[in-house]
Amino acid sequence: MKVRFQADADLDRRIVRATRRREQAISFQFATEARSGVGLINLPDDKVLAAAASEGRMLVTHDRRSMPQHFGHFVSAGTSPGVIIVPQNLPLGVAVEWLVTIWSASEAEEWANQILLLQK
């Protein structure tokens, strides 16, 4: 199965829009589209991880500070489709290219319980 992405509430919306524009077949939800439109706004990290996992989506976030720790706790108790951390200073085009490459060159199962920090 192809990777499906879920943006958290803090991810720059331009990343979602540009990725969707670059490859229309990619399933990438804004934070407001998650949980059948209820969204991920103002949820703690553990609930965001649970929501993404319940929909079988890799979480895409800028949160390098607390998300890795919450992710570690989450996968110690269950399974996650994975997390991608996009540094705030990563150029938009580079972030989009990474996400499109991950989507096109891998399967969702390969990312289970994995966390990836994107680099330039």
Q: Where do the language-model regions lie?
A:
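Acidic, metal-binding active-site segment of PIN/NYN-like and related structure-specific nucleases
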Residues: 45, 51-72
